[in-house]
């Protein structure tokens, strides 16, 4: 039993020895959390912040600012479970003054302005169940607009304001939503968003200038400068960072100009549409056709090439063609060329293709086939037939003297022989006699125009006078009853090709 009684006594002895060691470890242990300090500002938290601080811990830290300046302390968060500040508290002390202790039951000021440039921060904890501890920021008296790392855009209602962020706010727990272009949701942490936007650095902190405006439906998130921005939903307000020289007028001018240009464009469009429908009596016809916009000559317009295309109006071209056709139809068509001569003027098919009578009288050797004297009161051209027979002209046939005997008297044609002694004057319509056996004379037109049979008009054999009788030849010449005179001497007979073309 001694052994049994000695066992509990040994355990009690061990507990008595270890308890002071445990208490000494908690008391001497580092109970400080996140600490970032710079020349003018810094941030300090309890251990595990914003989680529960540990039991029986001590955190002691001396902070200073340049000499000649005073310290400004701001408590962003203080959550200590103790109500009497006996074992858990926060205390600030300087060479001349002491501030605290502060705990859950005591009123804690948000800001402390000290009369010195140095202060000692002491945080102690005992046995507790919950509590976040504290978050402290500080800065020199040069930055009276100091804010903590937990300040959000929704905490301020001014449209434009400026604040000073201390060093060390990047790793403080808290979310931001948005980006530099669209702005940040008003629930975002100001100093953390400023680091995300690149306005300040986490090691030094700095001043930020903010502009509060109407919120948007969605905020895009991204990672920048070691800070992750999350996607955000619709919010009533948002804030944007501006440069120090930028004011509200500078930000509002682009929006106002855009709205003014939009309204001006809509007004001009409405006026142009109204003028196009109703018309403007004070504007020229060209302006009404093209609207109210004037033609603008561009300085870099391409010059017109030297090549060009001539276009014709189809209607004008058709009108000219019809005029030409009408004028051509008014004249007589060009007859076929007979013999070796060239036709120099237009005439009817029934008109002799010789020169004027004036020229025939002057030169009897001029080119031409026939000399037809005109009687007064008669038309120069052949008249249409008065009966219903087919209107065909009597073919004119010239043959060589050697073929004269091939035509019979029944065919309606008679080939006269040469008359070496008979002469005719130009006034009587005659021609000089043939000089050789090869020269031929033409055929006389029958006195009666009535054809013997159907088909072509053929002169009857009995209607011809004997061409060898000078008396009958003289009588025919003086009569001039629309007959053809004999051809001039010296004309070559028609060849076989010309005869085929005539027929």
Swiss-Prot record:
Record-linked PROSITE patterns: CUB, LCCL
Keyword Transmembrane helix annotated: yes
List of residues that carry Phosphothreonine: 406
Region ranges (Disordered): 410-503
Glycoprotein listed as a keyword: yes
InterPro entries: CUB_dom (IPR000859), LCCL (IPR004043), LCCL_sf (IPR036609), Neuropilin_MCO_CoagFactor (IPR050633), Sperma_CUB_dom_sf (IPR035914)
Segments passing through the bilayer: 251-271
Residue numbers bearing the Phosphoserine modification: 305
Extracellular side: 26-250
Any Pfam family hit: LCCL
Signal peptide: 1-25
Keywords: Disulfide bond, Glycoprotein, Membrane, Phosphoprotein, Signal, Transmembrane, Transmembrane helix
Cytoplasmic side: 272-503
Protein name: Discoidin, CUB and LCCL domain-containing protein 1
Organism this protein belongs to: Mus musculus (Mouse)
Gene coding for it: Dcbld1
């Amino acid at each position: 039993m001694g052994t049994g009684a000695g066992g509990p006594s040994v355990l009690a002895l061990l507990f008595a020895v270890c308890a002071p060691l445990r208490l000494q470890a908690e008391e001497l242990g580092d109970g400080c959390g996140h600490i970032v300090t710079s020349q003018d500002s810094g941030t300090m938290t309890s251990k595990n912040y914003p989680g529960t601080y540990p039991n029986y811990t001590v955190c002691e830290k001396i902070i200073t600012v340049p000499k000649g300046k005073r310290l400004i302390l701001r408590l962003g968060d203080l959550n200590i479970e103790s109500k009497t500040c006996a074992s858990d508290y926060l205390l600030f002390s300087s060479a001349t003054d002491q501030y605290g202790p502060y705990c859950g039951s005591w009123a804690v000021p948000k800001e402390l302005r000290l009369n010195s440039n140095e202060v000692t921060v002491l945080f102690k904890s005992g046995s507790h169940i919950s509590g976040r501890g504290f978050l402290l920021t500080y800065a020199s008296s040069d930055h009276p607009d100091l804010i903590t790392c937990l300040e959000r855009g929704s905490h301020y209602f001014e449209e434009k304001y400026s604040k000073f962020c201390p060093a060390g706010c990047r790793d403080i727990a808290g979310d931001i939503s948005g980006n530099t272009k669209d702005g940040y949701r008003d629930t975002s942490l100001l100093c953390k968003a400023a680091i995300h936007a690149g306005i300040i650095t986490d090691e030094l902190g700095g001043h930020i200038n903010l502009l509060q405006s109407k919120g948007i439906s969605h905020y895009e998130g991204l990672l920048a400068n070691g800070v992750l921005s999350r996607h955000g939903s619709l919010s009533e307000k948002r804030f944007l960072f501006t440069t120090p020289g930028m004011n509200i007028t500078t930000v509002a001018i682009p929006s106002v100009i855009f709205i003014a240009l939009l309204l001006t464009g809509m007004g001009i469009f409405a006026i142009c549409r109204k003028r196009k429908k109703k018309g403007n009596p004070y504007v020229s016809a060209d302006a009404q056709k093209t609207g109210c916009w004037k033609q603008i000559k561009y300085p870099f317009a391409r010059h017109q090439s030297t090549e060009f295309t001539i276009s014709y109006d189809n209607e004008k071209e058709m009108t000219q063609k019809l005029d030409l056709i009408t004028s051509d139809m008014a004249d007589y068509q060009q007859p076929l060329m007979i013999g070796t001569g060239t036709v120099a003027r237009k005439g009817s098919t029934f008109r002799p293709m010789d020169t004027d009578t004036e020229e025939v009288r002057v030169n009897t050797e001029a080119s031409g086939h026939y000399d037809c004297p005109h009687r007064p009161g008669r038309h120069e051209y052949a008249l249409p037939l008065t009966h219903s027979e087919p209107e065909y002209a009597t073919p004119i046939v010239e043959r060589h003297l050697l073929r004269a005997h091939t035509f019979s008297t029944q065919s309606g044609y008679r080939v006269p022989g040469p008359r070496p002694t008979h002469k005719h004057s130009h006034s009587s319509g005659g021609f000089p006699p043939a000089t050789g056996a090869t020269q031929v004379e033409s055929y006389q037109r029958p006195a009666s125009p009535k054809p013997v049979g159907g088909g072509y008009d053929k002169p009857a054999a009995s209607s011809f006078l004997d061409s060898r009788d000078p008396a009958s030849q003289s009588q025919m010449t003086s009569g001039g009853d629309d007959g053809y005179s004999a051809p001039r001497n010296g004309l070559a007979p028609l060849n076989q090709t010309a005869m085929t073309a005539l027929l």
